[in-house]
């Protein structure tokens, strides 16, 4: 153990040593520690002493000889440099010191300053030789007599002179002014160039001088000081100007032995290199080692002789010593390498490409040129390229090939690239070949040579090219883009010797605009232009590029490739494409398929899912069409036209201001559907020997394809369906043509006449001669505008002109229906065409008898009127006769007659015979009828006259119940009948009572099923029968037919209709409902089931009819369902419907006053809320207008009435609310305050108002508020309380200063403007007198006095013990602190009267204006002190005031929430300690569409939430007293989050934008980069140094700003607890967030104890925090108490996007320095609570129950025995942490059992168990036995527990005295024997879950200010267990 401890101690020493050393390196610094300055002169000399890594305060010793001027940075709070200047004339050498004190660390740096006179000066330079046209900077430096250099000469004046050295007039140097030179002083950080330039501009020179070489030669430069009496001090130098020389090839030059080459000499003239013609008279050449190389002295021709190194020198003879040299290295070669580089067709090397050596594979592109270079390198390791000369033997083979050609370089380029070692390769065609290069050289002796050889393989490839389907062959791709839609497109590429897709590499120039995959699939990212480059993996120079432009779609058009109309029941195809702003179509846009919404303007055209129809896509691709972006298939359900619309709408922000904020593209197309073209017979043949058709039936139900006509007759036909005329721009066709015809001319046998006068689609077809033909009717639209494809429909009609082959009679039918004709023609007949079977008809009536012609094919004729008919009656004398009068009235045709039947029964024969041609047609058609046709053209029928028997109803659905009965009624026939059922197990016939045998029959159900009841009338011959179908069934369903949501006004009743039936949809008659045991089930007592006769209470009563009534009792929403009992015993349930009970609607406010131009959002209080809409109207729109949202605009003075009408889902009016509005111009204004008096040091808000209204009526229209106070010694305005820029200047806050009265005045102007209707401006002035009440002369108790309201019981304010809970008296459970009220014993009445009393830990008050003090006595130590005093006062004022709302202005983000605390004050402005529930308050706003306000359960807070951008004024008032009001202006919009943060140096902070309507893009800026740096794009900031600055965000039309404060170091650290945080089963002490302090001046007080701190939670709606200290360990915490699920459900503003977990932060800040803060983030996972009992008792009468959950509804629920219980979810409002769910529990078995339902939340592991007991009412003997055993166990357990407690108490009694004594006598700091002190509070009653911060502040202040109070460790506690 000892070695381990020693190692640990040694490690700590090392760490501390390292820390100390790091501190020595870091810290503040200055540039100089010793400075030499001249004395005060005519021109002062300044020196800047620069500091770094600190913020300095400057001081110096001798203020008489030195001046120090600090310089501040941009923040004006920190000095990092100072200017030093001597201010005393010279009187000998002087010394002083300057001190730089770092205000952050306190470190002091000393700088010694010497002041002395000049002894000499000297010109300093970098070189005495400068180039021709070159610059040189000369500087003067001064020295004292000890040769110490002066630190600065800036500011002194000098005289500079230039003079030729030879004394001539030609100068070789010229002066360059400083302002024209390229010199800089780094913005003043590295020089004083600005001062030196000013000196030159004034005509003198500074210590800095710049010259330029103008001519070759020598020049004298002199300088002397222009400062009396030191003008004799001077200096002089000589500078040489020479011409700059350079040699090519560049040095060093490596050559082979025997090589010969010449140098090129270049000189700089005018900063341009120029070659010198050799030989030159001014230049001579030489070599240092002539054994290695030799050189020509005139022209510089050099030859390498032997291996070695030497130098060639060229000298300019005009300037002595001006030479230039080049190193020559004669070497042997080591390697020969070939290089290939791309070569442009223009003859230039492509410089950006890197040459490829022969060590790599060479790939070249067919059709391109390449430069091949042969290079030689010397030996390794330092290989150098050898300069190839004309004498070197180097060769290249393989010039001729099928794949390439090699040519020499042009002469003009041979000097640059080398004629000997460079060639140009022209690639011709793809293929593979080789090149060979050799070098022959001397190996070291002139006699022997060696050869280097290299062979290189070359592959020629095709050029890499994109394959684009571009019309203009421009390599450009256009792709669309919108946010979250990334269009993709595959690019096709060829060439590059590629064999697979992996042989290409893809690149994009801007990945933020366009991305590309490894397979060539590009994806659009944002708008812009990017270049996609594809490169062959074998050759990086073989590539192709395509420009891809990504743009936002500008328009959308329909593709004109499909028909726009089609026949009903088929599909129309449609497709759209999009275009860019320039009209170009996109290359691909199918990614928008899902975003483009298709819709039609009619329900007859249905959009079906056609995205997977590949045939349509293939069809589009095969067409010459633009690429489709979206496709649709439209099913045509019915006829008509509509507009097909494709819409692409999306809201977003762009990346620059030139782009709009949304996209809304539409493309429309008119489409239509028509019925199939058909021919319908329009003329009726019913009276003319033809068939009948119903003109009234639907046109699509009746068409004709064949017509049979007798010559001489006609028929009218009508065209139905087909396309209608499209429009005037589309040609419409409607024709008739012959498909085929007989030999004769068509016009001679048929006539088709278009009846234009009657109807456009009517044709008359008349038959002229015998024969057959077919007609084709064509109708439709051809090509035209918006009609790209013709749509022509056709219909065929066959016409037969012939004679009937037979006739048939139709008896007792109103018309000649085709089915009746067909049945009659197919009936059996006897000779003479007499129908065998008689036709039975009822007697006593007139019946119609008609004849119809039948063709040889059995088809009925359409018209046979050309033929005449003869009618005959046989054996009908007493039975029937022709009613001629009726015939003449009803018909004029001979093909139908009317027969009158007598009331007799029997047989009667009717015959009709064709007798010839009608007389009107005989002349033309007399020869058509053949001889002997009468025998065949006849028909006869026998009539059986009887009475008809009928049974009603013919179908009956019967409920299966023994008590059910079915009555059947019979009519007609005789009274002799028999009834038979075909299934006796379903029903039986019961004979009716006497007297009803002939009219009724009764059935009784016997079993489930269907049966047919047949009734035979045996009284007629032949017997007649009638049928009835009976179905016996059990009820399958019951339904509430009145709707799923019902709204009822409170106090009224509502009738609900029911339906019952079976699965096939048939319903029972209401007479059977009484047998179904129908019950009404209501969730709660909001509504009650009442009887129909009276409104008596009858909940659960049976329903015996098809409707029942409910009465609305209380407000709210409940559910209701009904049940019916089946015969099997089971129950069927209806759907559950919602029933809402609403109060009568009221318009809020019901009466309002506004000024012209003001607005106010009205709302409806009460009224229904389910599926309703509200319509607002005003009677007089000239006075006020109102929008649909309820926003009322005052326009001009007057009065009007406002109606708010509430409509249901079907448009019916449900109810109405009425209000009134007055618009006027107030004549005067007044100033309003909540009280006329205010105490000294206290505050009170004041605001203007009008007699007719308040601030809500006019504040938006007024401005220029000017506040004044007559006597500011009495009253003052609080600084910065008026913020006119925030439009809150209408509210001001005054504070009392001294006793007295004074007048407060306000003046303001208002512009009452209603655009186009009213305009007037007025100025108002108002004032009031306020009194300031002074403090009492001696009011030491005022700070420790609690203000409470009268007749009030406080929360537990009085702690009962100073000991922790576990050390209290375990027997009595009483604390050791006793409280009592101090009373005046001299007055017995006052003594006995308890005006203020103590109840436990609470204080109770009675009347107002009472004051009492509370005495506290410690029973342990006997100490007595005054704990506090209580004053009782009336609540007189109200405020919305907190630290976050200091000046009545709030900035709130959209969607953001904020809690507004409600505080109460007395008449003097003194706040109440508590006033829970004493009075009511109202919170109102003029714009409820901007801000949502919610108050919860009379809590002293109002919660607001930003709804949309805008401003709203919030007013809080005591009751309806508007004088007792306070105002807060809320501005809702986008904000920077977090607002006004405080961070520490080195920390990071992410800024973001909250509350914006859409996604915001822009840039971030900081006003001071030295304090904080911020990322321009992301908004991430880093604190650099201490200070304050502003962070600004600039976006599209948006500029936001917030202040940032940076503190030095982290002073407060907050950590998160490691456990899972939830709001269920919260620890009693809450969740602990450890808070740690850094020991600096912010965190330590003068007494050494930790300073107090505050805790806050954000967002505040999830819980509350309070600070706490563990007195034993000294650890400090923020205790977090989350609100329960029940509290969150009732207090939170519910939104749909809430989650079951909430991220929050806990912030801790010092009370003395709130900027010093820290925070920690954590995640709260919501739990759940079960509302209701923890045990469910269910019985057979109610075998279902409901389980309700609140909170986190992501639970799992199950029971142990699934065969007994079923659990189903019936309702779930998933609002995250504040959700609500209901589960329905059904009993499946009718047997007694117990079970347990287990509800589990997987996220937290929370488990809740609910016991279930199902009692059938059977014998409880067995359970009683079990109950006795359980009771015995409980009694035994209680007995054991009592004994254990007694023993434990005895043990504690023996140990308490020792512990108590030790605790009472020990008064030092906490040691091992000190008990653990964790709590000093017993909470008797808690009105609010939040710790009252005023109470904490007050107790601290009371304890600190109490005289003679001993601040011992035991006594210094906070009653709320807080710091």
Swiss-Prot record:
GO terms for biological process: mRNA transport; protein transport. Its main location: nucleus. Residues 1152-1205 form the BIG2 domain. InterPro entries: Big_2, Ig_GP210_15th, Ig_GP210_16th, Invasin/intimin_cell_adhesion, NUP210-like, NUP210_Ig1, NUP210_Ig2, NUP210_Ig7. It is a single-pass membrane protein. Keywords: Glycoprotein, Membrane, mRNA transport, Nuclear pore complex, Nucleus, Protein transport, Signal, Translocation, Transmembrane, Transmembrane helix, Transport. It is found in: Nucleus envelope; Nucleus membrane; Nucleus, Nuclear pore complex. It holds the Pfam family Ig_GP210_16th. Glycans are attached at residues 73, 117, 289, 609, 863, 903, 967, 982, 1171, 1199, 1550, 1568, 1743. One of its GO terms (cellular component) is nuclear envelope. Residues 1-22 form the signal peptide. Belongs to the NUP210 family. This is Nuclear pore complex protein GP210. It comes from Arabidopsis thaliana.
């Amino acid at each position: 153990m000892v070695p381990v401890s020693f190692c640990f101690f040694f490690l700590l020493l090392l760490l501390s040593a390292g820390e100390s050393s790091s501190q020595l390196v870091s810290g503040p610094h200055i540039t100089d520690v010793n400075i030499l300055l001249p004395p005060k002169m005519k021109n002062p000399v300044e020196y800047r002493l620069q500091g770094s890594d600190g913020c300095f305060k400057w001081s110096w010793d001798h203020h008489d000889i030195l001046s120090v001027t600090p310089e501040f940075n941009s923040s004006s709070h920190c000095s990092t440099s100072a200017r030093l200047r001597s201010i005393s004339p010279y009187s000998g050498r002087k010394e002083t010191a300057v001190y730089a004190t770092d205000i952050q660390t306190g470190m002091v740096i000393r700088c010694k300053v010497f002041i002395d006179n000049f002894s000499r000066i000297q010109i300093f330079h970098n070189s005495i030789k400068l180039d021709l046209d070159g610059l040189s900077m000369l500087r003067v430096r001064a020295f004292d007599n000890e040769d110490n250099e002066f630190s600065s000469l800036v500011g002194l004046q000098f005289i500079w002179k230039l003079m030729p050295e030879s004394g001539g007039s030609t100068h070789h140097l010229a002066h360059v002014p400083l302002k024209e030179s390229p010199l800089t002083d780094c913005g003043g950080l590295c020089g004083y160039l600005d001062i030196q330039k000013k000196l030159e501009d004034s005509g003198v020179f500074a210590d800095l001088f710049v010259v330029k070489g103008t001519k070759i030669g020598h020049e004298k430069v002199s300088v002397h000081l222009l400062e009396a009496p030191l003008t004799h001090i001077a200096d002089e130098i000589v500078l040489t100007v020479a011409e700059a020389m350079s040699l090519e090839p560049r040095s060093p030059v490596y050559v082979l032995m025997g090589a010969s080459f010449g140098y090129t000499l270049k000189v700089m003239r005018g900063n341009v290199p120029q070659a010198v013609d050799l030989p030159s008279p001014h230049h001579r050449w030489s070599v240092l080692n002539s054994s290695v190389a030799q050189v020509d002295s005139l022209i510089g021709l050099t030859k390498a002789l032997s291996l070695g190194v030497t130098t060639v020198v060229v000298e300019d003879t005009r300037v002595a010593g001006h030479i230039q040299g080049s190193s020559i290295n004669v070497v042997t070669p080591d390697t020969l390498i070939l290089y290939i580089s791309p070569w442009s067709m223009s003859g230039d090397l492509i410089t950006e490409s890197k040459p490829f050596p022969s060590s790599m594979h060479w790939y070249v592109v067919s059709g391109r040129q390449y430069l091949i270079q042969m290079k030689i390198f010397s030996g390794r390791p330092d290989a150098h390229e050898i300069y190839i000369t004309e004498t070197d033997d180097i060769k290249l083979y393989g010039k001729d090939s099928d794949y390439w050609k090699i040519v020499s370089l042009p002469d003009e380029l041979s000097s640059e690239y080398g004629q000997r070692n460079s060639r140009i390769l022209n690639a011709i065609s793809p293929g593979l070949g080789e090149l060979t290069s050799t070098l022959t050289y001397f190996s070291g002796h002139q006699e022997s040579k060696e050869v280097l050889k290299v062979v290189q393989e070359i592959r020629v490839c095709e050029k890499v090219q994109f394959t684009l389907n571009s019309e203009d062959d421009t390599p450009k791709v256009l792709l669309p883009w919108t946010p979250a839609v990334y269009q993709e497109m595959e690019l096709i590429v060829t060439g590059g010797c590629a064999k697979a897709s992996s042989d290409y590499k893809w690149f994009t120039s801007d990945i933020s605009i366009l991305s590309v995959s490894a397979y060539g699939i590009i994806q659009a990212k944002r708008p812009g232009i990017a270049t996609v480059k594809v490169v062959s993996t074998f050759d990086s120079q073989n590539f192709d590029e395509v420009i891809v432009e990504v743009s936002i779609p500008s328009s959308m058009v329909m593709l004109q490739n499909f028909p726009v109309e089609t026949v009903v029941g088929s599909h129309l195809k449609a497709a759209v494409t999009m275009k860019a702003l320039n009209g170009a179509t996109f290359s691909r846009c199918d990614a928008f398929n899902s975003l483009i919404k298709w819709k039609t303007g009619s329900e007859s055209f249905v959009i079906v899912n056609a995205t997977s129809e590949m045939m349509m896509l293939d069809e589009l691709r095969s067409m010459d069409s633009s690429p489709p972006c979206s496709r649709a298939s439209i099913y045509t359900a019915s006829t008509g036209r509509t507009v097909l619309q494709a819409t692409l709408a999306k809201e977003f922000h762009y990346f620059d201001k030139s782009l709009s904020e949304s996209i809304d593209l539409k493309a429309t197309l008119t489409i239509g559907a028509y019925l199939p073209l058909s021919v319908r017979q329009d003329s009726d043949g019913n009276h003319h020997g033809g068939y009948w058709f119903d003109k009234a039936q639907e046109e699509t139900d009746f068409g004709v394809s064949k017509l049979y006509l007798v010559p001489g007759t006609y028929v009218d036909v009508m065209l139905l369906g087909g396309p209608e005329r499209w429009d005037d721009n589309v040609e419409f066709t409607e024709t008739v043509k012959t498909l085929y015809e007989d030999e004769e001319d068509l016009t001679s046998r048929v006539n088709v006449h278009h009846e234009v006068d009657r109807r456009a689609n009517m044709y008359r077809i008349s038959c002229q001669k015998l024969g057959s033909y077919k007609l084709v009717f064509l109708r439709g639209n051809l090509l035209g505008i918006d009609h790209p494809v013709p749509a022509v429909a056709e219909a065929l009609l066959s016409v037969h002109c012939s004679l009937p082959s037979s006739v048939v009679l139709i008896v007792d039918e109103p018309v000649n229906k085709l089915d009746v004709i067909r049945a009659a023609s197919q009936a059996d007949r006897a000779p003479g065409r007499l129908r065998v079977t008689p036709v039975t008809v009822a007697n006593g009536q007139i019946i119609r008898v008609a004849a119809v012609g039948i063709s040889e094919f059995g088809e009925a004729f359409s018209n046979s009127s050309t033929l005449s008919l003869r009618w005959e009656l046989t054996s009908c004398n007493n039975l029937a006769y022709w009613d001629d009068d009726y015939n003449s009235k009803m018909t004029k045709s001979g093909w139908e007659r009317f027969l009158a039947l007598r009331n007799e029964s029997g047989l009667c024969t009717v015959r009709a015979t064709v007798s010839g041609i009608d007389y009107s047609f005989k002349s033309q058609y007399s020869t058509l009828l053949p001889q002997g046709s009468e025998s065949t053209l006849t028909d006869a029928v026998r009539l059986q006259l009887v009475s008809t028997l009928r049974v009603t109803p013919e179908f009956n659905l019967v409920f299966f119940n023994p008590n059910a009965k079915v009555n059947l009624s019979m009519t007609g026939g005789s009274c002799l009948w028999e009834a038979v059922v075909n299934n006796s197990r379903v029903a039986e016939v019961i004979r009716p009572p006497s007297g009803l045998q002939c009219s009724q029959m009764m059935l009784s159900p016997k079993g489930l099923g269907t049966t047919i009841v047949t009734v035979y009338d045996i009284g007629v011959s032949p017997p007649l029968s009638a049928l009835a179908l009976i179905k016996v069934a059990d009820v399958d369903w019951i339904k509430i037919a009145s709707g799923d949501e019902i709204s009822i006004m409170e106090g009224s009743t509502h009738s609900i209709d029911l339906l019952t039936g079976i699965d096939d949809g048939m319903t029972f008659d209401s007479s059977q409902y009484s047998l179904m045991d129908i019950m009404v089930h209501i969730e709660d007592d909001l509504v009650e089931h009442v009887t129909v006769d009276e409104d008596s209470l009858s909940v659960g009563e049976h329903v015996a009819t098809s409707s029942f009534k409910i009465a609305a009792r209380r407000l709210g929403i409940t559910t209701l369902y009904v049940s019916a009992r089946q015969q099997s015993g089971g129950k069927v349930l209806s759907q559950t419907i919602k029933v809402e009970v609403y109060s009568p609607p009221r318009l809020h406010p019901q009466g309002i006053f506004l000024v012209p131009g003001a607005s106010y959002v009205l709302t409806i209080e009460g009224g229904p809320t389910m599926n309703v809409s509200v319509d607002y109207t005003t009677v007089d729109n000239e006075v006020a207008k109102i929008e649909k949202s309820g926003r009322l605009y005052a326009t001009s003075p007057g009065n009007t009435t406002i109606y708010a009408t509430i409509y249901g889902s079907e448009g019916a009016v449900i109810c109405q609310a009425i209000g009134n509005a007055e618009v006027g111009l107030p004549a005067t204004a007044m100033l309003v305050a909540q009280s006329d008096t205010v105490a000294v040091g206290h505050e009170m808000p004041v605001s203007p108002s009008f007699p007719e209204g308040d601030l809500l009526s006019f504040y938006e229209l007024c401005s220029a508020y000017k506040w004044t106070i007559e006597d500011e010694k009495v009253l003052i305005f609080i600084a910065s309380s008026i913020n006119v820029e925030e439009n809150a200047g209408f509210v001001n806050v005054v504070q009392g200063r001294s006793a007295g009265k004074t007048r407060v005045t306000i003046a303001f102007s208002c512009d009452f403007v209603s655009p186009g209707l009213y305009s007037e401006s007025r100025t108002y002035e108002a004032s009031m007198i306020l009194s300031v009440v002074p403090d009492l002369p001696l009011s030491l108790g005022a700070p420790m006095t609690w203000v409470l309201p009268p007749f009030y019981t406080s929360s537990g304010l009085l702690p009962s013990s100073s000991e922790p809970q576990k050390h209290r008296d375990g027997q009595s459970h009483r604390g050791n602190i006793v409280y009592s009220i101090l009373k005046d014993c001299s007055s017995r009445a006052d003594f006995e009267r308890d005006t203020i009393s103590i109840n436990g830990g609470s204080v109770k008050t009675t009347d107002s204006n009472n004051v009492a003090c509370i005495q506290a006595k410690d029973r342990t130590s006997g100490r007595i002190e005054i704990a506090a005093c209580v004053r009782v006062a009336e609540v007189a004022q109200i405020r919305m005031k907190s630290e976050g709302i200091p000046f009545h202005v709030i900035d709130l983000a959209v969607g953001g929430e904020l809690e507004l605390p409600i505080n109460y004050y007395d008449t003097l402005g003194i706040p109440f300690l508590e006033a829970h529930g004493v009075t009511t308050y109202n919170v109102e706003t003029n714009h409820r569409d901007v801000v949502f306000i919610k108050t919860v359960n009379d809590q002293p807070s109002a919660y607001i939430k930003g709804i949309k951008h805008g401003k709203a004024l919030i007013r809080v008032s005591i009751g309806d007293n508007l004088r007792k009001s306070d105002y807060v202006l809320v501005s809702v919009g986008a904000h920077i989050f977090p607002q006004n943060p405080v961070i520490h140096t080195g920390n990071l902070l992410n800024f973001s934008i909250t509350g914006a309507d859409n996604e915001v893009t822009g840039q971030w800026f900081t006003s001071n980069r030295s304090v904080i740096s911020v990322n321009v794009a992301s908004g991430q900031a880093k604190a650099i140094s201490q200070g304050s600055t502003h962070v600004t965000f600039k976006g599209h039309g948006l500029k936001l700003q917030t202040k940032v404060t940076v503190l030095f170091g982290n002073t407060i650290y907050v950590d998160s607890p490691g456990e899972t945080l939830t709001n269920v089963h919260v620890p009693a002490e809450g969740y602990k967030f450890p808070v740690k302090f850094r020991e600096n001046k912010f965190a330590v007080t003068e007494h050494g104890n930790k300073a107090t701190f505050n805790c806050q939670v954000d967002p505040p709606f999830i819980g509350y925090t309070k600070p706490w200290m563990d007195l034993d360990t000294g650890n400090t915490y923020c205790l977090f108490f989350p609100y329960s699920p029940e509290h969150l459900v009732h207090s939170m503003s519910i939104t749909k996007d809430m989650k079951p977990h909430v991220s929050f932060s806990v912030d801790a800040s010092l009370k003395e320095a709130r900027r010093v803060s820290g925070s920690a983030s954590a995640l709260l996972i919501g739990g759940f609570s079960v509302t209701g009992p923890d045990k469910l008792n269910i019985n057979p009468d109610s075998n279902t129950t409901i389980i309700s959950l609140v909170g986190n509804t992501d639970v799992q629920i199950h029971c142990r025995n699934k065969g007994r219980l079923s659990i189903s979810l019936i309702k779930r409002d998933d609002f995250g942490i504040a959700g609500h769910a209901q589960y329905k529990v059904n009993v499946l078995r009718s047997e007694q059992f117990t079970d347990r339902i287990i509800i589990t939340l997987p996220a937290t592991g929370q488990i809740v168990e609910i016991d279930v007991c199902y009692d059938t009412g059977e014998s409880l003997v067995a359970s009683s036995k079990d109950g006795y055993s359980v009771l015995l166990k409980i009694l035994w357990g209680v007995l054991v527990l009592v004994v254990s407690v007694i023993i434990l108490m005895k043990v504690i009694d023996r140990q308490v005295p020792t512990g108590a004594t030790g605790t009472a006598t020990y008064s030092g700091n906490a040691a091992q024997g000190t008990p653990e002190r964790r709590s000093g509070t017993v909470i008797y009653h808690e009105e609010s879950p939040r710790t009252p911060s005023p109470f904490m502040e007050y107790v601290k202040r009371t304890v600190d200010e109490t005289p003679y109070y001993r601040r011992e460790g035991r006594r210094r506690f906070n009653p709320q267990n807080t710091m």
